[in-house]
Amino acid sequence: MESAPAAPDPAASEPGSSGADAAAGSRETPLNQESARKSEPPAPVRRQSYSSTSRGISVTKKTHTSQIEIIPCKICGDKSSGIHYGVITCEGCKGFFRRSQQSNATYSCPRQKNCLIDRTSRNRCQHCRLQKCLAVGMSRDAVKFGRMSKKQRDSLYAEVQKHRMQQQQRDHQQQPGEAEPLTPTYNISANGLTELHDDLSNYIDGHTPEGSKADSAVSSFYLDIQPSPDQSGLDINGIKPEPICDYTPASGFFPYCSFTNGETSPTVSMAELEHLAQNISKSHLETCQYLREELQQITWQTFLQEEIENYQNKQREVMWQLCAIKITEAIQYVVEFAKRIDGFMELCQNDQIVLLKAGSLEVVFIRMCRAFDSQNNTVYFDGKYASPDVFKSLGCEDFISFVFEFGKSLCSMHLTEDEIALFSAFVLMSADRSWLQEKVKIEKLQQKIQLALQHVLQKNHREDGILTKLICKVSTLRALCGRHTEKLMAFKAIYPDIVRLHFPPLYKELFTSEFEPAMQIDG
């Protein structure tokens, strides 16, 4: 039986720690300085011998240590320091596992036992971090195995080579007259259309696409997010009868939700509204890339003029690929958010995919207001707060201006996390998307979400007309996403191979026209 949540993991780092586990008394932020990592030269790779130590298996020669370190920590993805307790890990995860074994600690998860563990969030949940350590094979018994077998050495050497090649591509400095390298390369087979259409449905189901299992460069774009467990929430059946909210079309409460087939608006209890609002808010907070408080604390960390010029001097295709990667990362969190919304997983798979293809970027733009600083007109991007000038090399200044104008406008509404969550869910569950099979079912779900949003706005004593202002943003969001598609298609017409080979599969699945026929419904 699990005990009460333990105190945060002591942050004292062992010698040689990468610095992701902060010093005692400090707090790790999710905003790592990627530029520091990019400056590290790729390590040479040679075959090496290994010996067992009291703490695990480590490289015998100090000069060979960096060969193992090129493989990231299997627990959190930070820079590794060797093989510890049978697994390649960083110093922080090695120390965490050692302390957990020495103290026989029992941790509890304050959420749903499926927390994402990476270098930015590993200290937030000790239970899930320990479970991941055990899942990848960390064990005190691993130190007893002695020398590695030839098969193990060959496998490790192959992995080192693969990561070295990837790092060389990432860290290679652009030479005069040479184009900055693009990485990774995605191999599209003759039937790639069907396979990539399957990527999104597999991702919704919580499975990593088969193609990405074979290539870690591809899988790096699919976050290690476990399938969402069943939502427990409130026990509606155990709640005493509450006042009934009977909202009808005549009352004007649903001016933004169309009714088809003679359907009437739902009759919803206050308890059900509270439950839905709590479910969506909780799902939102659990699937945000960054904590709002942490983002607000580093708004002063803007790009220097020299750094801005570095972005401006990037090749257009390189900057496009970087933005595609960042958008894809954000969308992965939106997919997980959708999966946790009560009712979404009960929709047919076709409708789940249609809603995500149509609405995921809209939700990304809504969430952007959390990372937008209206005072200096910057948004969090690639480790710091960026002005529109950072994106100049994309070649679409009008679109970037549109994005920043929307971010500033939504930010000026000062939405709470609950309000952002419910508005995001409302936008995502739009019943007017093309190719939906169960429009009425989605309509009813969206209507309930709108009621919950109205309920929260009233509880927060927001001014009259705030809901109308929010709903008016929907048309702006769609125009914004339409502009994104136009710019992408223009770029793709010039650089078709760049998009085909170097853009993340999920991004292409969502936004490029070559995948749209897969969504069509017969009849």
From Swiss-Prot:
One of its GO terms (molecular function) is oxysterol binding. Pfam families: Hormone_recep, zf-C4. A zinc finger (NR C4-type) spans 73-93, 109-133. Gene3D superfamilies: Erythroid Transcription Factor GATA-1, subunit A, Retinoid X Receptor. Residues 272-510 form the NR LBD domain. Phosphorylation by conventional PKCs in neurons inhibits transcriptional activity. Phosphorylated on Thr-183 by MAPK1/ERK1 in vitro. Induction: Induced by oxidative stress and DNA damage. Isoform 4 is induced by hypoxia (through transactivation by HIF1A and SP1), but not isoform 1. Coiled coil: none annotated. GO terms for biological process: angiogenesis; cellular response to hypoxia; cellular response to interleukin-1; cellular response to sterol; cellular response to tumor necrosis factor; cerebellar granule cell precursor proliferation; cerebellar Purkinje cell differentiation; cGMP metabolic process. The keyword DNA-binding applies. Widely expressed in a number of tissues. Expressed in both regulatory T-cells (Treg) and effector T-cells (Teff). Isoform 4: Highly expressed in the central nervous system, including in the cerebellum. This is Nuclear receptor ROR-alpha. It comes from Homo sapiens.
